Amino acid sequence: MHEMSIALSIVDAVDAQARVEGAGRISRVELVIGRLAGIEPESLRFCFPAAATGTLAEGAELDIEEIAAVAVCGACGFRFSVTFPVAECPECRSLRISVVSGEEFVIRSITIEEGD
């Protein structure tokens, strides 16, 4: 389960930023994860509390927005949902497709509370 290492990296990043801001604690972390990013949101939710133990993010709420995978056909311009990184256009069967969303993995925001 690589989600634990991802959770640890997220906690490291948000903890460092919160310390720069002089925070006393982090109350919320918001992520954007595309369906093709190779990350299981439920596993990440499970790992996050353990990864956050002993940091400013301990007890923080983890909010994850999942982004659908969408591709555009380079031959006919048709936009369509994809479930795998490789797909063909359902309209013209071309393999000239470009994924335009669904690969995101972003820390959108953190909510911090001021330190003492």
UniProtKB/Swiss-Prot annotation:
Pfam families: HypA. Zn(2+) binds at residues 73, 76, 89, 92. Keywords: Metal-binding, Nickel, Zinc. GO terms for biological process: protein maturation; protein modification process. Ni(2+) binds at residue 2. It comes from the Bacteria. GO terms for molecular function: nickel cation binding; zinc ion binding. HAMAP family: HypA_HybF. Involved in the maturation of [NiFe] hydrogenases. Required for nickel insertion into the metal center of the hydrogenase. Belongs to the HypA/HybF family. This is Hydrogenase maturation factor HypA. It comes from Chlorobium limicola (strain DSM 245 / NBRC 103803 / 6330).
